[in-house]
A protein has these predicted regions:
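Amphipathic alpha-helical segments used for helix-helix packing
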Residues: 85, 99-121
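C-terminal peripheral helix-coil segments that are non-catalytic and often amphipathic
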Residues: 88-96, 131-147, 157, 166, ...
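Short, solvent-exposed amphipathic helices
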Residues: 103, 121-132, 136-139
């Protein structure tokens, strides 16, 4: 009879495995490396995840939950104008990448490029994350429209998607250049152009 799953072991697998995938890439990270980093026997991996693909979905869920927990409240701050909240939100995300020396990129973008061509489950998870992300930004943009801060002719949902696309592009550039310059360009040129 198999032993019952231990939530601490699962969390350790997600944390250590997520770090490895962020640093090396999904395809370059094996189950044995993940379990070794987490300090658990290799066979234990399959007590928590049906497959490496299921693990990918789980680390994406964990990563996105962390982003929402850390930065999501910025978009809901009622004492701050909506467009200022959006600028602060993206500045917070940029600061995260600065703290990591622009080396790891965004797990969402990395996995979209690396894994979606071969995994429908990962693609579906990423699509759900992008919808959630876009929805949170669009709600803030609708509030800006209602307050007269954003032109009535702009579609908040399309604008939110465009902001994400532009920011994710800046993340990729910072990873290549190991420089904050792409974020500075996003903040100085892209953000003001799109939201005024």
């Amino acid at each position: 009879m198999p032993r019952p799953a231990n939530p601490e072991t699962r969390s350790r697998l997600l944390e250590k495995g997520g770090e490895l995938v962020s640093n090396r890439g999904f395809n370059a990270t094996g189950v044995q490396e993940i379990t070794a980093a987490a300090g658990v026997p290799k066979g234990s991996f399959y007590n928590y995840f049906d497959s490496k693909e299921a693990f990918a979905v789980a680390i994406l869920t964990d990563y996105w939950d962390s982003v929402v927990a850390t930065y999501g409240a910025i978009l809901d701050e009622q004492g701050t104008p909506p467009l200022s909240r959006i600028a602060r939100y993206f500045a917070g995300l940029a600061e995260f990448h600065h703290r990591h020396r622009y080396a790891v990129g965004c797990l969402i973008g990395n996995m979209a490029l690396e894994v979606t061509p071969t995994s429908e489950d990962v693609r579906a998870k990423l699509a759900a994350i992008y919808r959630d992300w876009s929805g949170a930004l669009a709600a803030c943009l609708r509030e800006a429209q209602a307050r007269g801060e954003l032109g009535a002719g702009k579609d908040p949902q399309q604008l939110a998607g465009t902001l994400i696309d532009a920011f994710e592009g800046a993340v990729m550039r910072t990873k290549v250049e190991r420089s904050r310059a792409p974020f500075d360009n996003f903040e100085r040129f892209v953000l003001p152009t799109l939201v005024t």
